[in-house]
């Protein structure tokens, strides 16, 4: 068994990560799952959350990336995440929380005013993603304060 697997993170805009890693932990729809070299093949839905990338070993996180959801394909040598939106956690933590709260308020109003199910679902997806960002920032601030 190889000691590394290839990890790729792709958003609609660009390829964000393509590197060999020791392990990645992905927020799946049914909970977090870790991927090591030799993992059984699977395709899963990714929920909004943080991907932890372990570059050199399985004990030290080398990079943390927020994803807004998507899909992951896992093989024995590769983990590819197709994310609807992704950003480094450090960049996300610098976000203006007041602006995010305003977006949430506006999205809730837009959902109430939506004229079709398609429009409503798209707005609800944006609301879930924006709320996940705000919750993540709050939890990181709470952890730093403790």
Curated annotation (Swiss-Prot):
A Pfam family per the record: ATP-synt_DE_N
Cell membrane is among the record's keywords: yes
InterPro entries: ATP_synth_F1_dsu/esu, ATP_synth_F1_dsu/esu_N, ATPsynth_dsu/esu_N
Membrane topology of the entry: Peripheral membrane protein
GO cellular component: plasma membrane; proton-transporting ATP synthase complex
Intracellular or extracellular location(s): Cell inner membrane
Coiled-coil regions listed in the entry: none
Domain of life: Bacteria
Keyword vocabulary terms for this entry: ATP synthesis, Cell inner membrane, Cell membrane, CF(1), Hydrogen ion transport, Ion transport, Membrane, Transport
GO molecular function: ATP binding; proton-transporting ATP synthase activity, rotational mechanism
Subunit architecture: F-type ATPases have 2 components, CF(1) - the catalytic core - and CF(0) - the membrane proton channel. CF(1) has five subunits: alpha(3), beta(3), gamma(1), delta(1), epsilon(1). CF(0) has three main subunits: a, b and c.
Function: Produces ATP from ADP in the presence of a proton gradient across the membrane.
Protein family: Belongs to the ATPase epsilon chain family.
The protein's name in its UniProt record: ATP synthase epsilon chain
Organism: Rhodospirillum centenum (strain ATCC 51521 / SW)
Underlying gene: atpC
